[in-house]
Amino acid sequence: FNWLATMWGGTIRFTTAMMFACGFICLFVLGGFGGLILALVAVDFTLTDTYFVVGHFHMVLVGGSVMLLFAMTYYWWPKMTGYMMSEKLGKWVFWLMFLGVFVTFFAMHLSGANGMARRVPVYFADFKFSNYLTTIGYAM
């Protein structure tokens, strides 16, 4: 957690790049908690081949790579090109992306914990709401 120690005691300005970096930490840690749950043998046996594993993998992957790519772009683009990007628009992009990623993959965690299997052509009607939440989050 050296990322948090770097910010400790500092004067933090929440620019768009910093918001994407903090969003990375939040999504990476929340997705990582899913990995801790999957480390338990009995739970892993139950949740294997469910959407819980898909939600865990993608929350860590998207939270880890895409958020940092956006942070890097917002930080380095003005330094490379000499043109500033809109902070207001960047913060809108951050919040829409952060909430979209969280809603999409957290709904997958809940679906998988309730038994929604992967690689099935037709799902039970019980999972209609969680699939709807996943679609809404994806559309964000």
What are the functions of these language-model segments?
Residues F45-L47:
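Active-site-adjacent structural elements in folded domains
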Residues T6-G10:
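Short amphipathic alpha-helical coupling elements at transmembrane boundaries
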Residues F1-A5, T16-A42, Y51-G82, S86-M140:
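Hydrophobic cores of alpha-helical transmembrane segments in multi-pass integral membrane proteins
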